[in-house]
Every structure is written in structure tokens, then in C-alpha cells.
């Protein structure tokens, strides 16, 4: 697992009148700017993409995001892993139900029936809270992110958000809580766009097979805290 992927909103107080319709959504009372981020269990932010208008949903933001640019360019490092005796080429992200059924996304079951599916749902939802915790820590630690933004341009808001994210990671590293305290730079590779790489990314068959293998693997482990009580079934 590479981390948990999700989006959050920052209220834009000084949004120009002519842009308010573009940056507002029905479930938000004020104009907002979105942030897409990937966080791990130590709350380290591995990926951040800030700037999309608040009227968009997570899928629209994903289509603009550079999250999979390295994979499509053929410059991403290999990270194969094996689960349930099946070999997979790339790592995966934990997401909620709105994201597409790509090979690199693992989503929970909306209505699990099998006991193993119920255990998987519990574990998935518990692990995916990493990114929600990261957003909560960011907004509580940096008050400027929790209050309506007074900047007049998205460019300045983006700079503020990225600055807070960098400081957030620096604090985690300085406290010694980072899973990977040393960053090893990948060797430079000439970008080569590969159509097959994108096809592999969005492959639904791999998505469902990986999900099934993870359910079977989790079900084979002795994890009493994930057992479903008879009252909850």
C-alpha cells in the first residue's frame, strides 16, 4: 500500500465575484479551493495537488492531477508485490467509493455480505483514516488553512498550502516519526510515453482481482479486533 488518497477544501474568502460560481458547490456554502493528497500512517504527505476549483469532485481533480504522470511517462520505479500467490506490478492507494475502478485503487465494500468482506471493510476504513487525520492535523496546526483564505489569487493560496505541507513533513521528520526518514533520489530516466502503462493503470480486471486477493489474505490472518459481532451482522 502506497498511502490513502483523498481531497479536502479550503474556503476562499476573497474569491472574485466573477469566479464564485466556478469555485462553489452545492454542499459548500462558500467558494473553496481543493487539495488532493496522499498520506501514510505516519501522516507524511507523499503527494499534493492544490488549485482545482471547489465546484469539482474528486474524479475531476484526479484527471488534472500529476499523481500518475511518472507511470505514464515510464519513469516511475518498479514496486512489485505479491498477495494471495498473485504478483502485481504496481502499488495501490486506498480510496473511497467515488474513485474509478483502476488497478491502483482499492475501495471498500458498500454492502459486504461475506465475513471476510466485513473484516476487509473494517480494516480498509480504519486505514483510510490516515489521510483524514493528516488533513485534520494540517488545519489544526496551521490556522491559516482552517480560516477563510484572504488571498486574492489561487496562485497565492497554492503557495500557502504547499508551504504548510512542507513544514508539516519537516516537523514529522524532525520528530523521528517518519516511516522513511531518508529520501533517496531516483536516478534520472528519459521520459517515454507508454500507452500500455495507462491501459494497465485503468484495468478493471486487475482492480477486482487485487481486491479479492486482499480480502482472502486478510481473512486468513488471525485478527480478533476485526471480527464482526453477531449483533452487527
Residue spans of the language-model regions?
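Short, well-ordered secondary-structure "scaffold" segments embedded in the functional core
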Residues: 1-233
